[in-house]
Swiss-Prot record:
Cytoplasmic side: 852-864
Glycosylation sites: 61, 73, 94, 112, 176, 194, 229, 252, 298, 338, 433, 448, 492, 505, 561, 719
Name this polypeptide is given: Receptor like protein 24
Similarity field: Belongs to the RLP family.
Each LRR repeat, start to end: 100-125, 127-148, 156-182, 183-205, 207-229, 230-253, 254-277, 279-303, 305-326, 327-350, 351-376, 378-398, 399-423, 425-448, 449-472, 473-492, 493-514, 515-538, 539-562, 564-585, 586-610, 613-637, 688-712, 713-735, 736-760, 762-785
Amino acid sequence: MKTVFKSLLLLHFLLLLLLCFVSPSSFFLLKVPVGGLVACRLRQSQAFMQFKDEFDTRHCNHSDDFNGVWCDNSTGAVTVLQLRDCLSGTLKSNSSLFGFHQLRYLALNRNNFTSASLPSEFCNLNKLKLLSLFSNGFIDLSHNDLMGSFPLVRNLGKLAVLDLSDNHFSGTLNPNNSLFELHSLRYLNLAFNNISSSLPSKFGNLNKLEVLSLSFNGFSGQCFPTISNLTRITQLYLHNNELTGSFPLVQNLTKLSFLGLSDNLFSGTIPSYLFTFPSLSTLDLRENDLSGSIEVPNSSTSSKLEIMYLGFNHLEGKILEPISKLINLKRLDLSFLNTSYPIDLNLLSPLKSLSYLDFSGNSLSPASLSSSSYIPLSMESIVLSLCGIREFPNILKHLQNLIHIDITSNQIKGKIPEWLWTLPQLSFVDISNNSFNGFQGSAEVFVNLSVRILMLDANNFEGALPTLPLSIIGFSAIHNSFTGEIPLSICNRTSLTMVDLSYNNFTGPIPQCLSNFMFVNLRKNDLEGSIPDTFYTDSSLKSLDVGYNRLTGKLPRSLLNCSSLRFLSVDNNRVKDTFPFWLKALPNLRVLTLRSNKFYGPISPPHQGPLGFPELRIFEIADNMFTGSLPPSFFVNWKASALTKNEDGGLYMVYEYDKAANSPVRYTYTDTIDLQYKGLHMEQERVLTSYAAIDFSGNRLQGQIPESIGLLKALIALNLSNNAFTGHIPLSFANLMNLESLDMSGNQLSGTIPNGLGSLSFLVYISVAHNKLKGEIPQGTQITGQIKSSFEGNAGLCGLPLQETCFDSSVPPIQPKQEDEEKGEVINWKAVAIGYAPGLLFGLAIAHLIASYKPEWLVKIIGF
């Protein structure tokens, strides 16, 4: 996957090189600064300045060598316009951009266009030869008729380069699309979008293509047979789609230098002719359903193939013998091939240039791992995870160029050999998930090493923590039995960014240097004392987890200096403090967990307005002593939780903490959190960025549940149980379309269960037990599929799954009356927020009036 990204970055780099060299010699090539035009005609200069004024350019980097304007030497007309990371605002259909009719090359990459769709007026720029709009966040091509003529490119017959990658385009690609009329195209990139359709055979009409990238979309079905027409193509990227069928017919594409088909569903065998292509240097076929043996012709010894990834397939027969003929290989991935016999690494000896090897998930011959065996001395990175290895592979002892070793998830016991630390280039060591219990020789051997990443997770280490290398960047020792105090020497490791010592037996206080790091996890130890109040201004701290210890005192106010903080968990300690309203000043805080401490007092702001925390996604304050009621507008400002699922575009809360350009791998840190979910206590080892959860259970909160909770469309789990909430269940719960778990048990709620809860199609768990609810449980919905105990303790409830039948089951309960009475409570709290400060009462009255008469209209206008 990482190689795919690198390849696509290279692809973009080639595009930019093309942009630099395609300008005809008749052009005036003196680049005009973005800040002012001195060589173009006055009218063109004015038009450009007008175009700039349509956007916010405060963050534009005027020193960026990419940004600029070129003008024709004879006419003075703008012919080349390049602006990246510069423009913020809406690209409108009447933009002055579309008045530059002489434009040949237009690159507006990585800007912040807030417009959802691409204006069709691009088609008026009919002299364009290059159009690059990658990474702009466009999400809609409906106004450009993606399924039809695609007006964006209808008249752009001279276009040679088109890059619309890394946006959010969706829909299907119709064979009649005018895209396929661009017969001059040499470079086409639609990668990283959401286009879902079969691959039209008319791609074969674009027979001048040299680079084609359709990766990371939803293309399905068989690869178009006319691909054999693309005889000029040098780079073909079809990664991460859902393409099926036998291997594509690419035997005519003899100019290929890069062929990427990974993460699809291709089946059959790998054709041997690939290894005869004279220019092929990269072949990526990972994660398909390919089978059979590999046949490499003897003539392939002159092959230029340097990178070959075949992992996660079903290859059979002798694998390494034919591969050993590809003597120019530098990177080889044969992971998880499901072979039925042990693989002998000695067969790699002809590959003298091999620097990267991944054999994970395969059975290796024990003899081939001994010190008497041979693998290329050029090896820099070796991955042998899940290979059933029982002894430390001594074959590594001779690899003086080794930088990265990964032997995770094997069955290796005993101590780590001392010779490992004598390898002069060793920087990345991951030996997690084995049974190591110590280190040969003195643990002080670490100190002067060049090791930057050291991962010791899930082993049997015990005793004091070893002294870490001075060069260490990331250190993780999760799930071991280390004891004693956390050594103060870690405070002297000035490069240390990530330290994870969770799930050990450390005692004593937390070191004072927490703000030196970016990621700190001390969860589930036996630490005591208070959290150090030593976070300095502009601290880079992003994640702090000290849950499940014996910490006391108050939350340190110096956390306010950590403007990058995204994750804060102090759950299951003995912290005694009031609710930290002051944390709302942290602009990036996504997760706040205060569960099971001694926090007390109200959680409503002193002015009784909305709670802050605009980016908050997960808010856990269960099992404390919080009191008071929640004002109606309590949830209005929770903008992140108001997003729909995945609307923020992320996947997991994953942070990269080693970004060195020469790193053979990228190490990341993921947050862990405990949740009460679907009535169960669950530990989430990876937290989705789109996940939103609230847990107020086990406190002393009272009053009505605010209707504004219905704004939090991203909510997946909501737990308000074991409080003293009164009043009716909010009708706005019906807006929580992603809700999966809802617990309101153990309160004093009255009235009926709203029918709207039955429309929540993802709701798999609900409990309203032990309240004062009455009436019939909504029938014919997922609610009736719940267990009986979810509704017990409500004397007035009847209907399935309870045994109590309603008075007259033939007549449905009259719930609309209550809902009509409560409709005045269904207020659009976004409107309340707009006019909240000076005129709360007036705003509530107006919102009440509007919502009562035309709620659908109001919702449409505001966008919920």
